[in-house]
Amino acid sequence: MDAIKKKMLMLKNDKENALDRAEQAEQAMKDAQEKNVKLEDEINDLNKKIRMVEDELDKAQESLKEATEQLEAATKKAADAEAEVASLNRRIQLVEEELDRAQERLNSTVEKLTDSEKAADESERARKVLENRQGADEDKMELLDMQLREAKMIAEEADRKYEEVARKLVITEGDLERAEERADLAETKARELEDELKTTTGQLKSMEAQATKASEKEEAYEEQVRDLSAKLKEAETRAEFAERTVAKLEKNVDDLEDALYAEKEKYRGVSEELDQALNELHNM
């Protein structure tokens, strides 16, 4: 009888111990599952952060590309404007040289015309002197008449040359006016190009500043990417460690489940033995 009671007490203790171990195994399994869920959430958060950084890096690279294209376009436009200004300056210089040559020709023509007028005046004075000399011989008179005709011819030639010079002067003045108009237009165009060049230069400086900022921003992004890459590597290491830990925990859970199953089997066996002992006790 004492042996049966002692055996029943042992079976009861074994049953309680089995229940405690089963509860501990279930709690350990729950803790392992919660830890596994937490690690999976951390890995998902890291993946989201990595995708966000990659998107920001793509946007920064696109902005840098656009700024570089605008800078190249502005540089080409400035170079074209400088070339056009240089061409206009050369044309203005050629017009000024042509104007100087026309002025020289005009001065030479006016000087020749002045000489012709002086010769005509001298011939007229000589003719008057000859007319006053009533007693001069006929040969001298004929000579003077011939000189007078020559003087008239010279005067007519001078008048013709004067008209020709005047006509050329009018043409030259027209050419000069047109040249001055072209020069004014060229100066206006040059001023417009200078203003446009200043504006373009300002835009170029602004774009260079933007490109510098974009470069700095890109460097900052690259630094962030390096940091995030390091963090990603660390996270991957942690994830690998977590995966190994999860695998280990899953193995522990499996072991605990096996132990729980064994304890349940043991509990069932103890219960059966206890029931059998109770039946034997009742039969006695």
Curated annotation (Swiss-Prot):
InterPro entries hit by this protein: Tropomyosin
Keyword Ribosomal protein among record annotations: no
Biased composition (Basic and acidic residues): 112-134, 186-198
UniProtKB keywords: Coiled coil, Repeat
Gene3D superfamilies: 1.20.5.170, 1.20.5.340
Coiled-coil spans in chain: 1-284
Start and end residues of each stretch annotated as Disordered: 106-134, 186-221
SUPFAM superfamilies xrefs: Tropomyosin
Domain notes: The molecule is in a coiled coil structure that is formed by 2 polypeptide chains. The sequence exhibits a prominent seven-residues periodicity.
UniProt xrefs under PANTHER family: TROPOMYOSIN
Chain's role: Tropomyosin, in association with the troponin complex, plays a central role in the calcium dependent regulation of muscle contraction.
Family: Belongs to the tropomyosin family.
Record note on quaternary structure: Homodimer.
Protein name: Tropomyosin
Organism annotation: Branchiostoma belcheri (Amphioxus)
Gene: TPM
